């Protein structure tokens, strides 16, 4: 076919000149420019000029001067050809139609056409197409089979299309469209296929083909003009026909011949259908004509018989002219009357009854009288019709045979109705037949769309799904029939459910994507297979050659006669020899055929040489392949690590973690929870969204070592490292109730030294790391007989958690320290010292109190360079490790110093303080002196100090005891509570929303100015903020406070008002609650979370992954392996060693992954990203340390935990956290000790106004409220009501109550105004959206019926009455 296309291009290249370029050019050109030539070389050999073309156009214009539209259509044809909208055949057909009947114009147009395209009169009158020969169809099918021998699906699809057409399941248009799609890239086949189409479709398909070719050539920018290709169409057809007959393949099977018959059938299809329609139409017309003829014949017979019966003389000759005219007019009137009756009668049944009556009368069944009675029953509703019928009946009596006329009328009408019903039935039958045919065609079409397609190519995404692997085939999918299937097989075998494959890079391995290690194994297998096939092939060829050579040597074969080399060598043997000699392979095989005796010894030697060479090569490669298998076998089985690494970074992002808990919150938000929150007074139910158990506490030590080691690698400074480790040890592990590390335990530096031979250069690092959390984690104070697991942390500096250090080292002398503290805090004004006990002054109960806030240490505490200590009375500094030791220390000091000691205060963290110096801070007048505070210290007011954990004894004799126990502590606490005041038991006084945070003690130049700002803010908080009660956070949300004031209010309790339900909901003694933001939530999640995401993949985070490694290492399989190999170290220690090697950079990721696989197995894929996870965790710790808001949350946590266990309320803590975080996410993190569990809940951001709850009040405020503000009896004279005297005079003689009742008639009063009062400042403020309501209805106007004079008199009377009342 390529040669034919080349010939086309070659022959078409001579038509190059455009038409109409100048008048001087030859007559071969057309006056139409561009688009290619219509022809070259006319009938006459003379040169044609442009003048000839213009002359022809003028002649056409003159011919159609009265038909201007035809001339315009001719010009449009030429323009379409110029624009390549039509081809030469289209031009010729349209010109023939235009110039039909004008032969001179047709002959003139032939001069512009190429040779072979002339329009003849025979063509104009009767164009016919050459009959396609059967051999041409066979040749075309063989050509398709040869063309698509490598793609049998196209060939089979083509045969199936022809088969469907032969069965009348497809029409010719569908056949052509599908074949066009099939031969889209083979235009020559499609062009040849159009020759076999019927005449009605061939021109259209030919034009469509040429347009598609033109588009393709235009896109390519090259190729022969389309019209020039059409000029040689007939010649090419003749050449292809001759060539196809000569090259016809006789090996076509019988099925192909049957399919080829459909090609010839296409030419007869249209003619058969037309003939069939014509025959059906003629048969229907014939039936109608026969019915009419029967009626006429019946009428003539009846007429003759009636004449005989009446005695008239019958004659066969034609009647007279007047008689014929009378009968004709009578018949016409009768038919018109019947039509009128049919129109007037609405019912078809009545009309049929009328005709039956006439029919019975014509047959002689009834008489005239009976006919009139029956007709009157039918036409009785229409008197005019009945009268006309009677008149017509009377006129017809004189005419020969009225019965014949009635018979004709009834028969004609009945015949027409029968013909109508017959035609209707025929149409219905035709429609039913067409519907059946269309249904069969539709069924075949539905089957046809699946023919030629494998199941893998079907789109079954919308079909019913059984399992992830099986889909139900569509109901119209053709199920192949199965032979020899028994009943047992039919009961269990499946024909309708198919396995759907999805996703792969090729068709060889569809169900799972290969990883790189599998690719290596597959390549090894391919190499091994190829080499084995080479060895087997060369071995087989050598064996055959050796056998043939032995036969030749033994002279058991004769080369004369019928010796064939194929009898001794297989095709594979010969192919092996050809490949062995490369380009000379065919020559070698020819030598074997010509002279096997001389060629075989050389070939056999060569074969054995190659066999030995390839055998040695395989032995060498076996070593390489074994190494590849050993390295990649376990890796190839790990299909999860590839996807896990991709998803792990996304799953560990803060956005993904926050989104996960939000989704869980939305799912768990039920209507019951909403009702519970409403019934609890806007308190949210405690329903955790995430819960995690800590099964192995030993893992915490490993996590601490990993974090400490990573901080040395990641953090840039030692100070930053220290802050991160303090946050981990003093907050995170305390929240999780991790036991404190004892002094002398193995430090991280020792672990790293033993595992990696690395040592830290600083000698002090070991000591400081051992004592990182001694202060905070060893001290637990016992109250009321129970051990309270308080946080035991102090608040000082920026955050007490981060700046606390327990090294116990002393870098400054005590005197220097005291001097420095005094000098630092000496600049504070007097106003700053009076904040803590301002409320006590107002109540008149000035008591001796010492600020015991956990954010400030007693005198003798050093907060420089992270050193913290406590000074006892003897001047020595130390740290008490147990509460009992603190009590013993207090007792010993009391015994030694006696009366010199004022008070011993034991803080919530177990530290002792000497208050003798604190007492000295009071001046001689008994007034409060300056209270020393550290930078950022929290200073609760004096009236709420009873909520903190204190130990004090006002009477020295009560403290003179030799032993102190937990019971003694409880008694002392009770005494302290009794002596602190009557309001010690009141709940909620520790939660004032406007108590000041505390002022920073700074040595900067602007310290006094900042101090003044803080004092101003504190004063404003006392006077305004406390008056808001539970709504102080609402005031802040509305922006009534400046931003600086909000900062100072960040860690203060919200309100003194606490819900009654909150008194019952105390915090459990073995649990710790922390309210944090997104940073803390992500920190705890990275520490330990195992959640199931949407892909059912465990997202183990640090704790869970280390725990999984330890679990796998201690599994039964690992124990069995260790029993076999007694020399192998502990698998978990080996894993930790590999992890530390990865962290310090001495091992690569691939080595670490191989080590994990060797230790744990394929389940170790979750450990491959541990380095990134630890890095992310340390970065999160750094973010928490550096963020101001996170530090404030830590301060608030310490502040709340510094209270006594009975004084801590979760609702107050939550409201304080809300003030800090505003509209940010708030998380409730609760850790319990037994069992060790972490619960996380995302709280609702409630902005609604909470209800006010009943609370207990201070006695002083109660006395003021009841005795002064709301008192009805007072020494002052009450003001008289302002009443108009003229109104009072109208009710003379009535008492005050009656007057009030009389005056309030028709008045509506609603007292709804509310006000609230601050318990500290007694300031009153009104509640918004509340008011009092007073309304008096107007009197109705009197009737207007009264006269104007009467109204005037009434008005005058009222005026005189008013004057008399005023006197």
Swiss-Prot record:
Residues 33-42 have a biased composition (Gly residues). The keyword Cytoplasm does not apply. The modification Phosphoserine is found at residue 1023. Residues 46-116, 130-200, 327-396 form the PAH domain. Gene3D superfamilies: Paired amphipathic helix. Its main location: nucleus. GO terms for cellular component: nucleus. It comes from the Eukaryota. Residues 851-876, 912-923 have a biased composition (Polar residues). Residues 968-989, 997-1016 have a biased composition (Acidic residues). Keywords: Nucleus, Phosphoprotein, Repeat, Repressor, Transcription, Transcription regulation. GO terms for molecular function: transcription corepressor activity. It is found in: Nucleus. Residues 230-286, 299-311, 424-446, 806-819, 958-967 have a biased composition (Basic and acidic residues). Residues 14-44, 212-322, 417-446, 786-883, 912-946, 958-1031 are annotated as: Disordered. Acts as a transcriptional repressor. Plays roles in regulating gene expression and genome stability. PANTHER family: PAIRED AMPHIPATHIC HELIX PROTEIN SIN3-LIKE 2, SIN3B-RELATED. This is Paired amphipathic helix protein Sin3-like 2.
């Amino acid at each position: 076919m390529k040669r034919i296309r080349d010939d086309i291009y070659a022959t078409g290249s001579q038509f190059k000149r455009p038409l109409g370029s100048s008048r001087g050019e030859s007559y071969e050109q057309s006056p139409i420019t561009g688009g290619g030539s219509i022809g070259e070389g006319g009938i006459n050999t003379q040169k044609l000029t442009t003048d000839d073309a213009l002359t022809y156009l003028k002649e056409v214009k003159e011919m159609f001067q009265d038909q201007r539209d035809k001339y315009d259509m001719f010009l449009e044809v030429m323009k379409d050809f110029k624009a390549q909208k039509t081809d030469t055949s289209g031009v010729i057909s349209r010109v023939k139609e235009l110039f039909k009947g004008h032969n001179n114009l047709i002959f003139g147009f032939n001069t512009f056409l190429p040779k072979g395209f002339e329009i003849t009169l025979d063509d104009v009158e009767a164009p016919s197409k050459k009959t396609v020969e059967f051999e041409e169809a066979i040749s075309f099918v063989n050509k398709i089979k040869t063309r698509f021998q490598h793609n049998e699906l196209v060939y089979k699809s083509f045969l199936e299309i022809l088969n469907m057409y032969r069965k009348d399941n497809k029409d010719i248009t569908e056949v052509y469209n599908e074949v066009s799609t099939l031969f889209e890239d083979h235009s020559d086949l499609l062009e040849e296929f159009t020759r076999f189409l019927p005449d009605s479709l061939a021109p259209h398909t030919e034009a469509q083909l040429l347009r598609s070719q033109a588009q393709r050539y235009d896109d390519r920018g090259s190729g022969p003009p389309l019209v020039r290709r059409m000029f040689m169409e007939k010649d090419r057809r003749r050449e292809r026909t001759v060539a196809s007959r000569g090259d016809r393949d006789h090996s076509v099977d019988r099925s192909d011949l049957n399919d080829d018959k459909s090609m010839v059938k296409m030419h007869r299809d249209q003619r058969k259908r037309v003939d069939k329609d014509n025959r059906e139409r003629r048969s229907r017309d014939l039936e109608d004509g026969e019915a009419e003829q029967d009626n006429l014949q019946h009428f003539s017979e009846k007429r003759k018989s009636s004449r005989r019966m009446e005695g008239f003389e019958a004659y066969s000759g034609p009647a007279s002219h007047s008689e014929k005219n009378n009968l004709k007019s009578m018949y016409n009137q009768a038919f018109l009357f019947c039509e009128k009756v049919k129109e007037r009668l609405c019912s078809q049944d009545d009309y049929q009854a009328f005709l039956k009556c006439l029919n019975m009368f014509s047959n002689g069944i009834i008489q005239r009288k009976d006919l009139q009675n029956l007709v009157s029953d039918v036409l009785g509703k229409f008197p005019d019709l009945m009268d006309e019928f009677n008149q017509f009946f009377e006129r017809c009596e004189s005419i020969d045979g009225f019965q014949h006329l009635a018979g004709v009328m009834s028969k004609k009408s009945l015949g027409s109705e029968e013909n109508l019903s017959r035609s209707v039935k025929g149409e219905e039958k035709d429609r039913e037949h067409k519907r059946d045919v269309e249904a069969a065609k539709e069924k075949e079409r539905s089957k046809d769309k699946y023919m030629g397609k494998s199941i893998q190519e079907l789109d079954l995404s919308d079909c019913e799904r059984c399992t992830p692997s099986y889909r139900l085939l569509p109901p119209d999918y053709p199920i192949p029939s199965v032979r020899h299937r028994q009943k047992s097989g039919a009961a269990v075998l499946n024909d309708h459910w198919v396995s759907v494959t999805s996703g792969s890079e090729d068709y060889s391995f569809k169900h799972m994507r290969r990883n790189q290690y599998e690719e290596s194994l597959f390549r090894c297998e391919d190499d091994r297979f190829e080499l084995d096939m080479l060895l087997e092939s060369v071995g087989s060829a050598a064996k055959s050659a050796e056998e043939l050579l032995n036969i030749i040597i033994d002279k058991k074969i004769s080369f004369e006669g019928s010796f064939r080399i194929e009898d001794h060598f297989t095709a594979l043997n010969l192919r092996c020899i050809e490949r062995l000699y490369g380009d000379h392979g065919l020559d070698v095989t020819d030598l074997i055929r010509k002279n096997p005796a001389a060629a075989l010894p050389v070939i056999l030697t060569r074969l054995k040489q190659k066999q030995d060479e390839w055998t040695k090569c395989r032995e060498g490669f076996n070593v390489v392949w074994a190494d590849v298998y050993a390295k990649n076998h376990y890796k190839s089985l790990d299909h999860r690590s590839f996807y896990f690494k991709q998803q792990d970074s996304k799953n560990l992002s803060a956005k993904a973690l926050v989104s996960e808990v939000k989704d869980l919150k939305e799912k768990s938000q039920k209507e019951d929870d909403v009702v519970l929150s409403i019934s609890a007074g806007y308190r949210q139910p405690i329903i955790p969204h995430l819960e995690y158990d800590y099964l192995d506490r030993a893992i915490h030590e490993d996590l601490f070592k990993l974090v400490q080691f990573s901080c040395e690698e990641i953090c840039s400074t030692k100070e930053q490292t220290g802050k991160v480790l303090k946050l981990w040890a003093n907050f995170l592990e305390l929240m999780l109730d991790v036991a404190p590390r004892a002094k002398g335990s193995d430090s991280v530096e020792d672990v790293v030294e033993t595992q990696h031979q690395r040592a830290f250069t600083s000698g002090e690092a070991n000591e400081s790391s051992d004592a990182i959390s001694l202060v905070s984690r060893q001290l637990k104070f016992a109250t009321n007989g129970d051990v309270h697991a308080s946080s035991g942390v102090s608040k000082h500096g920026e955050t007490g958690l981060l700046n606390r250090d327990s090294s116990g080292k002393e870098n400054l002398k005590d005197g220097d320290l005291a001097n420095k503290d005094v000098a630092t805090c000496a600049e504070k004004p007097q106003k700053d010292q009076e904040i803590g006990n301002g409320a006590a002054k107002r109540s008149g109960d000035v008591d001796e109190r010492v600020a015991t806030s956990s954010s400030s240490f007693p005198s003798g505490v050093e907060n420089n360079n992270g050193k913290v200590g406590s000074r006892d009375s003897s001047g020595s500094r130390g740290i008490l490790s147990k509460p009992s030791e603190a009590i013993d220390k207090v007792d010993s000091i009391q015994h030694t110093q006696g009366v010199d000691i004022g008070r011993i205060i034991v803080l919530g963290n177990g530290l002792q303080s000497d208050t003798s110096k604190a007492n000295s801070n009071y001046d001689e007048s008994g007034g409060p002196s300056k209270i020393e505070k550290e930078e950022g210290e929290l200073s609760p007011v004096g009236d709420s100090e009873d909520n903190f954990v204190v130990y004090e004894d006002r009477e020295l004799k009560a403290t003179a005891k030799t032993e102190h126990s937990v019971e003694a502590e409880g008694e002392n606490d009770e005494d302290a509570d009794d002596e602190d005041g009557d309001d010690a038991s009141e709940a909620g006084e520790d939660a004032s929303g406007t108590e000041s945070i505390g002022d920073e003690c700074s040595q900067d130049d602007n310290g006094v100015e900042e101090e003044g700002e803080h004092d101003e803010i504190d004063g404003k908080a006392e006077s305004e903020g406390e008056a808001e009660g539970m709504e102080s956070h609402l005031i802040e949300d509305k922006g009534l406070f400046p931003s600086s004031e909000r900062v100072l209010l960040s860690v203060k309790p919200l309100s003194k008002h606490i819900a009654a339900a909150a008194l019952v909901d105390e915090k459990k003694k073995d649990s710790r609650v922390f309210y944090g933001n997104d940073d803390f939530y992500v920190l705890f999640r990275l520490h330990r979370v195992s959640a199931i995401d949407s892909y059912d993949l465990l997202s183990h985070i640090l704790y869970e992954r280390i725990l999984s490694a330890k679990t796998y290492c201690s599994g039964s399989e690992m124990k069995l392996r260790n029993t076999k190999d007694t020399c192998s170290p502990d698998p978990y220690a080996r894993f930790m060693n590999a992890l530390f090697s990865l962290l310090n950079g001495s091992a690569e990721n691939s080595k670490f992954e191989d080590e994990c696989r060797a230790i744990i197995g394929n389940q170790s894929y979750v450990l491959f990203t541990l380095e990134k996870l630890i890095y992310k965790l340390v970065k999160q710790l750094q973010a928490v340390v550096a963020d101001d808001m996170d530090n404030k949350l830590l301060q608030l946590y310490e502040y709340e935990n510094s209270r006594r266990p009975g004084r801590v309320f979760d609702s107050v803590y939550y409201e304080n956290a809300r003030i800090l975080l505003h509209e940010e996410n708030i998380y409730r993190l609760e850790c319990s000790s037994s069992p060790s569990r972490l619960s996380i809940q995302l709280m609702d951001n409630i902005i609604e106004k909470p209800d006010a709850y009943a609370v207990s009040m201070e006695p002083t405020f109660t006395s003021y409220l009841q005795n002064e503000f709301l008192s009805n009896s007072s020494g002052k004279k009450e003001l008289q009501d302002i009443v108009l005297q003229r109104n009072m005079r109208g009710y003379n003689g009535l008492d005050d109550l009656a007057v009030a009742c009389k005056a309030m008639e028709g008045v509506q009063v609603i007292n709804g105004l509310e006000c609230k009062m601050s318990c500290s400042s007694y300031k009153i403020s009104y509640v918004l959206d509340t008011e009092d309501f007073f309304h008096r209805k107007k009197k109705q106007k009197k009737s207007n019926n009264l006269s104007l004079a009467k109204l005037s008199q009434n008005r005058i009377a009222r005026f005189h009455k008013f004057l008399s009342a005023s006197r």
